[in-house]
Amino acid sequence: MQKVVKLNNIKIGNDLPFVLIAGPCQIEGKDHALFMAEKLVKLTSKLEIPFIYKSSFDKANRTSVNGIRGLGIEKGLEILSKVKSEFDCPIVTDVHSESQCTETAEIADILQIPAFLCRQTDLLQAAAKTGKIVKVKKGQFLAPWDMKNVQTKLEAFGVKDILFTERGACFGYNNLVSDMRSLAIIAELNVPVVFDATHSVQQPGGLGGSTGGERKYVELLAKAATAVGIAGMYMEVHQDPDNAPSDGPCMIKLDNLESILIKLKKYDKITKEK
């Protein structure tokens, strides 16, 4: 029987209708966060898709020292708290160091471990100590079966509810490729699997001082992942991605999200029909 992670009234499982995890790459300010959350909550409510809001208070792995990192943990968590209280939606955000975990867990329902840090034992242990759901993004450098080692660490630290995210694998220089077999392989660990459709089209360092991306392939990869069968779809969304402070080339435009989700719901239903 496939593992199901429960979060409030949301059930996350590979055999259940997919959950959408979405929001802008980084927290840009209170007004912008509330604007995005309102749009996403209304849309997912209309389409009857369970929704978790995602945004980052710090982009600690920017390509360049000049890259905009975000508002920081204090201001960022304050804004995420407003989103959570105003729209009654769960929150996921990333932590980059052990010192951030306890404070972040006061607001976030899910702690996300960035792909580059997925093997950092001390960070995994600190996240585990919070008692929150821990969502780990598979490193671009890891084979899908290597996530078993991450699972073993988390379970040793007492984590009961784990989510793993596929976000592509390094394919030569400045490029990622999505191996859809990875979704099935990770699911064999009996962990709900999330597909990150927007970071999977990244071109790391592809613009020299920043990361490039191929937004036009987001929908294609999202359809493929949904056809395989996933617990969650992760998408970074922005009303004006070309002018966003980070990951603009990868994020999808807010106005285009509804049509994509309608298609994904159809794929999801067919895949999970008994």
Swiss-Prot record:
One of its GO terms (biological process) is keto-3-deoxy-D-manno-octulosonic acid biosynthetic process. One of its GO terms (molecular function) is 3-deoxy-8-phosphooctulonate synthase activity. The lineage of its organism: Bacteria, Pseudomonadati, Pseudomonadota, Alphaproteobacteria, Rickettsiales. It comes from the Bacteria. It holds the Pfam family DAHP_synth_1. NCBIfam families: KDO8P_synth, PRK05198.1. This is 2-dehydro-3-deoxyphosphooctonate aldolase. InterPro entries: Aldolase_TIM, DAHP1/KDSA, KDO8P_synthase. The keyword Transferase applies. Belongs to the KdsA family. Its EC number is 2.5.1.55.
